[in-house]
Swiss-Prot record:
Keywords: Antiport, Cell membrane, Hydrogen ion transport, Ion transport, Membrane, Sodium, Sodium transport, Transmembrane, Transmembrane helix, Transport. It is a multi-pass membrane protein. The keyword Cell membrane applies. Mnh complex is a Na(+)/H(+) antiporter involved in Na(+) excretion. GO terms for molecular function: sodium:proton antiporter activity. Belongs to the CPA3 antiporters (TC 2.A.63) subunit F family. This is Na(+)/H(+) antiporter subunit F1.
Amino acid sequence: MPFKIFIITALIIVVLSMLAMLIRVILGPSLADRVVALDAIGLQLMAVIALFSILLNIKYMLVVILMVGILAFLGTAVFSKFMDEGKVIKHDSNDRH
């Protein structure tokens, strides 16, 4: 029983942290702050899924955690490229069809 209380407490803390990051995404003074906050939300979502997996004793949620991690990484990479170059996909001027 104390183990479940610990997991539920950790779950509440992570969810409150996600809400704080959501405020940073909405109010963030710069685009870089918003990108970092979105990345943090992705990591916290992975933690929430892991804690629910432990609490409910579901083993196959590891695949979902990995997919969320991959999507969070790709989102951060795309936003970083957009911030650096102003566009995500660079078109070559010699590549005309």
